[in-house]
C-alpha cells in the first residue's frame, strides 16, 4: 500500500470514528491546509491534523503552530492531532480507540492532552 493511500485511509478512519461519536465530519480536499478534518457538533469545531505511520508518525512544529493559529481565529474551535496506526496489540494510552484495522488517538493542542471520544 502506498504512503498516500495509507494516509487517506487513516483520515477516513479518524473521520468515521468521529462520525460514530456524533460529530459531523468534513474532509479537506487534497488534505491541504492545517486541518485534514473539520468536525462539528453543538457549536463546537474540531480542527484535526491526521498523522499516520506504521512506526512513529512525523509532524513538523510548523504544522502544529499553523493548526493552533487557525483555531485561534475561529471561535469555539479546538486544534487536535490524531495519530493513526495499524492495529497493534498494545494501546498507546487509555483513550486509544480500536477502529477496524486501526488504532486511533486524539490529542488536544497545545497541551497534548489525550481526548476520550467514547465517554
Question: Could you tell me what each predicted segment is?
Answer:
Residues 1-28:
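Acidic-basic catalytic patches of nuclease active cores, encompassing PD-(D/E)XK
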Residues 5, 76-119:
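Domain-level recognition of nuclease-like catalytic cores that cleave nucleotide substrates
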Residues 20-34, 38-42:
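Active-site metal-binding core of divalent-cation-utilizing nuclease and nuclease-like domains
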Residues 34-35, 44-45, 76-80:
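Short, surface-exposed beta-edge/turn micro-motifs
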Residues 54-65:
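Active-site-adjacent loop/helix micro-motif of nuclease/hydrolase catalytic cores
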Amino acid at each position: 500500500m502506498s504512503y498516500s493511500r495509507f494516509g487517506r485511509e487513516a483520515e477516513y478512519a479518524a473521520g468515521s470514528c468521529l462520525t460514530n461519536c456524533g460529530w459531523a465530519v468534513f474532509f479537506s480536499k487534497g488534505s491541504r491546509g492545517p486541518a485534514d478534518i473539520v468536525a462539528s457538533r453543538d457549536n463546537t469545531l474540531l480542527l484535526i491534523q491526521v498523522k499516520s505511520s506504521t512506526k512513529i508518525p512525523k509532524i513538523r512544529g510548523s504544522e502544529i503552530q499553523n493548526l493552533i493559529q487557525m483555531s485561534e481565529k475561529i471561535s469555539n474551535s479546538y486544534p487536535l492531532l490524531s495519530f493513526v496506526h495499524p492495529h497493534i496489540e498494545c494501546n498507546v494510552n487509555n483513550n486509544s480507540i480500536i477502529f477496524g484495522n486501526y488504532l486511533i488517538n486524539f490529542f488536544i493542542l497545545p497541551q497534548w492532552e489525550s481526548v476520550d471520544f467514547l465517554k
